[in-house]
Amino acid sequence: MPFADELLGVDVAATLTRSIQGAVPERVLHELPRAADAFGGLSLRERADVLREALLADIPGDYATLAQTIRSAAEHDPAFTGWLIWPVTDAIAARAVHEGTDASFDDAMALLAELTGRLTAEFAIRTLLRHDLDRALDIIAGWTHSPDEHVRRLASEGTRAYLPWAIRVPRLMSQPDATVPILDALYRDDSESVRRSVANHLNDLSRDSPELVVETARRWLDAPAPTTQALVRRALRTLVKRGDPQALALLGFGPATVQVDGPLLADARVPWGEEIRFTAVIRNTGAEKARLSVDYAVFHRRANGTLSTKVFKLATADLAPGEELAINRRHSFRAITTRRYYPGEHALALQVNGIATPPVTFELLPPGEDDASR
């Protein structure tokens, strides 16, 4: 697995072993030196789990013993950084939860904050959030004022409802407003990485709580920083693709009087792995300037024959009365790791300020079958 090998491979496991051995030279490490032997065929997440368990086995005892070892390694070894931090922070959280005391919980939160700048502690903190969300959020509220931008980013990123690669925290999904005070404290942050996390966090909430997201974005636009408009656009991107009228209106894309000619497809049959070209013309037929958000939706065929919709950004435009916007776009069906294609009927539609055109169908041909008419 080249991707996993590059991030959590044999070399990283060896570096972690050396760092821990340097922190506890009197201890014989049995599990860490051979942990990488189990890496074959494992995903990145699974490799982190293997190293976490090896570290916990080699540093047995209470939470304080592990925390002291980790702090010593961090203080004395410049190589104690990068992807090895993932299993290290996982081990810290696991040992603290296992011990079950407020003192170990609070120190684990502090130690994650100390280490997050060396990679990120956003995955490990989920274990602590699941264990005691209220206590964790009280601590995280203080992080929003940290002079360290990595800690401020952790406050937002670590508490995202749908953080990629991370375990879910059920209460973050059932209580979506629980993290809004964190976002309120950070949306005007000086750090772009913090603001980007805030936008992604709010976008996560739009899956289940669109009204909360729109109301939060509206409050921010009422008390903005120079960067707030861009942050809100990113935070509302999913709602815009859904055609949510409140989100669109908040960004200035209200009802518009337009005529949409298209989409017109260049071909009705698309060879496997090729692309489809489509065109359209959007005309402002009203008496006032029209501000437009234009997307297109591809209805992909699933294995069971049903269709799933994916929306893609096309353009934003301001059209004077009578002015036209010409669309000319290609959509690729080349193989990618994030989507599996199935031959058969697909469809494509335009979406202008949330209003969709009727879908136009086309056929994605099976592999090896060419379209002789092309």
Where on the chain are the PLM-derived regions?
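Surface-facing alpha-helical segments and adjacent helix-coil boundary elements at the starts of domains
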Residues: 1-247, 256, 271-279, 288-291
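Short beta-strand and strand-turn-strand segments in soluble, beta-rich domains
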Residues: 258-261, 302-316
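Short glycine/proline/serine/threonine-rich loop/turn segments at secondary-structure transition edges
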Residues: 335-345
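Short beta-strand segments of immunoglobulin-like
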Residues: 264-271
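Short beta-strand elements
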Residues: 355-374
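Short acidic, flexible loop segments centered on an aromatic residue
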Residues: 291-302
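Short solvent-exposed strand-capping/beta-turn motif centered on an Asx-Ser/Thr pair
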Residues: 283-289, 355
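A beta-strand/beta-hairpin structural motif
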Residues: 309-336, 364
